[in-house]
Amino acid sequence: MGAFLDKPKTEKHNAHGAGNGLRYGLSSMQGWRVEMEDAHTAVVGIPHGLEDWSFFAVYDGHAGSRVANYCSTHLLEHITNNEDFRAAGKSGSALEPSVENVKNGIRTGFLKIDEYMRNFSDLRNGMDRSGSTAVGVMISPKHIYFINCGDSRAVLYRSGQVCFSTQDHKPCNPREKERIQNAGGSVMIQRVNGSLAVSRALGDYDYKCVDGKGPTEQLVSPEPEVYEILRAEEDEFIILACDGIWDVMSNEELCEFVKSRLEVSDDLENVCNWVVDTCLHKGSRDNMSIVLVCFSNAPKVSDEAMRKDSELDKYLESRVEEIMEKSGEEGMPDLAHVMRILSAENIPNLPPGGGLAGNIIFFRRHVIEAVYSRLNPHRESDGASDEAEESGSQGKLVEALRQMRINHRGNYRQLLEEMLTSYRLAKVEGEENPAEQAATAASSNSDAGNTVAMQESHTESKSDLAELDSCTEDAGTKMSGEKL
């Protein structure tokens, strides 16, 4: 079974809550992936005497969901029940536990749960080779503890700007690369042994079996980085998200986007849903999960922002009417054609961060569809099939490259760039099925085993190349001793 579906699963899981002066909302979507491997934790009021503390986390699983799901249920108890963390509770007496004790307790909790899961029969005998990143925050009355293991990410938005961001654990980072090489491994095509795209994770026991090395010295380490930050009145919100979100939006883009949505809605689930929908349209082909935690100083619904949203709706209504009237003599255009025209225009009052196409398609599609249906009540199709076909073709192209990687490891990224360029050119020239032709070319290049010169494409999106970087890490199969 391939890594991608023919069409994305867009149903969302949502939750929200409040307590300890915080509000949170979350959203997760399977998207184009064959399986949903993300998980999350949201606890307001930590047991064992820390009721004024809260804990939130996102887990991005790969090669299966076993590890991510277990961690979402049990990581917090492994943290709070270990001796180091209990010592933290005792050391502070009536005051907040010391920062160093809390950090040591969190670190010990990660190592303990990783050691504990290794004894699961399916993980021990290799029947399940899954692993998971983990990014979280533990919020006390005085501090915010940011916790990261892998390439999911957390950001803090304070005083109208990104104040802090965790650092992704990638094999190409110098410190991570040094540890991998000291354990006898290598970093090829920005992956551990040419296969795994993260250098720290829970699970992934195939990469944690080097004799004479401790758990934090293995090819893949379960040790988290823990950062503490003093809370401030200016704190607005924290975002936790997997790389399915960060692959297509930068820290600043996402925070500005969230800020703009909080100014028109106080429903945090809706805000998170807007993020996920926008990332899907911007090209993310991974599972997508986001947890949004708002402090009391978070942006509030604004009359000015609501007015701009209303003006945007009116503008789009008039533009759809104009497009339909101009096309009347040549026949009624389909909805996808109308969307493409609008996506190429410089439309006023769009929220920041989503990009023109992303904002129009997902924020105001209902407005556009309503006008279109009124002017064309007998339409046979809403044009969505065209969008699905285009995205599905790109998925087939990436899957063909994944299969080709078995026979052509050294050059697959260059080949992906060439195939994507070929795909775009074919679309411009009007070929009927450019994805199949590109996939055939990929197969031909793989058989020949020749080096393909890298071609530049000025329209290349970040997610195009990120797709192949992510599509092999969760396949859960083995070939020549490497996970594909």
From Swiss-Prot:
Membrane topology: Lipid-anchor
Keywords: Cytoplasm, Hydrolase, Isopeptide bond, Lipoprotein, Magnesium, Manganese, Membrane, Metal-binding, Myristate, Phosphoprotein, Protein phosphatase, Ubl conjugation
Residues that coordinate or bind Mn(2+) 2: D60, D243, D286
Entry binding sites for Mn(2+) 1: D60, G61
Annotated stretches, region: Disordered: 1-20, 431-484
Position of the Glycyl lysine isopeptide (Lys-Gly) (interchain with G-Cter in ISG15) cross-link: K12, K142
Cofactor(s) it depends on: Mg(2+); Mn(2+)
GO terms (BP aspect): N-terminal protein myristoylation; negative regulation of canonical NF-kappaB signal transduction; negative regulation of defense response to virus; negative regulation of interferon-beta production; negative regulation of non-canonical NF-kappaB signal transduction; positive regulation of canonical Wnt signaling pathway; protein dephosphorylation; regulation of canonical NF-kappaB signal transduction
Composition-biased stretches (Basic and acidic residues): 1-14
Pfam family, one: PP2C
Top-level taxon in the UniProt lineage: Eukaryota
Major site of localization recorded for this protein: cytoplasm
EC identifiers of the protein: 3.1.3.16
Cofactor details (free text): Binds 2 magnesium or manganese ions per subunit.
Residues bearing the modification Phosphoserine: S391
Residue stretches making up the PPM-type phosphatase domain: 23-295
Residues bearing a lipid moiety (N-myristoyl glycine): G2
Keyword DNA repair included in the entry's annotation: no
Role of this protein: Enzyme with a broad specificity. Dephosphorylates PRKAA1 and PRKAA2. Inhibits TBK1-mediated antiviral signaling by dephosphorylating it at 'Ser-172'. Plays an important role in the termination of TNF-alpha-mediated NF-kappa-B activation through dephosphorylating and inactivating IKBKB/IKKB.
Record family assignment: Belongs to the PP2C family.
Subunit structure of this chain's protein: Monomer. Interacts with PAK6. Interacts with the phosphorylated form of IKBKB/IKKB.
PANTHER family reported for this sequence: PROTEIN PHOSPHATASE
Protein name: Protein phosphatase 1B
